[in-house]
Structure formats: C-alpha cells, structure tokens
C-alpha cells in the first residue's frame, strides 16, 4: 500500500503466528515473560479446553487459551492458544491486540454456544476471575 502512495504503518505487535501441529498452536502479542520484561503489571486469564462443551463433544479437549493483560490499564497484551483449531481461532484475538482492547471490552463480546470460540470469552472473563466454566 505504501508503494501505491498510501501512508500505512505496520503494527508488528499484532502479527499472529500459527503452528500446524496436533494440537495446533497460535499466538499473537506478548507472552508473560515479555510483558514482565517490558514492565507491565501482568494479569493472566486461562481457560482449558477440557471445560469447553464443544471441544469435549469433538473429542479434542487437549489444550488451553491464555490472555495476557496489563493490570493497570486492563489492555490485552497477548493471547495464546494451544488446542483444537487454534489457527482458526486466532483472528479475533489478533484484532483485540491490534485495536488495543481492554479485557472488559473483549469479555463483553458474545460468542455463540456451543463453539470453540467461547473459550476466548471465558479466558477474558478469567482475567477478572469471572469465568463461569472453570
């Protein structure tokens, strides 16, 4: 886009990674260690796929979803997924990191039931100790 005359800036903090293993792995943003090294007041919300009705019904309940947030601003710093269809679930977390969403904003996103994506909302609620399935 820049070569065509547009003035665009790339946010490398919001570039997802995907590993096509079994289970799949997907990640965007900072991990816990990186967030601590950068001086953030790190808060973590974690949701296991063993608590996901959809993952259990699929017979693919191995793994978890983890959200890393800044405790002082509630901003989402990173989201990491190990589990079924992680590479398909990472776009929504990528948007949250790119848009600098807060955990509270992200947790208010409605996820259809039963879906694997519900784990995203549950992990956000877990940051504030509000998850209902764990």
Q: What are the residue ranges of the model-derived segments?
A:
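Glycine-rich active-site loop/strand segments that organize a redox cofactor
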Residues: 6-11
């Amino acid at each position: 886009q820049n070569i065509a005359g547009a003035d665009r800036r790339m946010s490398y903090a919001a570039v997802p990674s995907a590993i096509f293993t079994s289970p799949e792995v997907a990640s965007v943003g900072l991990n816990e260690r990186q967030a601590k090294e950068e001086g953030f007041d790190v808060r973590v919300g974690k949701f296991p796929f063993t608590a996901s009705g959809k993952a259990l019904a699929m017979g693919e309940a191995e793994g978890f979803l983890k959200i890393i947030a800044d405790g002082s601003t509630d901003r989402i710093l990173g989201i990491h997924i190990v589990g079924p269809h992680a590479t398909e679930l990472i776009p929504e977390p990528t948007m949250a990191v790119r848009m600098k969403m807060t955990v509270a904003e992200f947790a208010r996103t409605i996820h259809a039931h039963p879906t694997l994506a519900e784990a995203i909302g549950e992990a956000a609620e877990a940051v504030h100790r509000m998850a209902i399935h764990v």
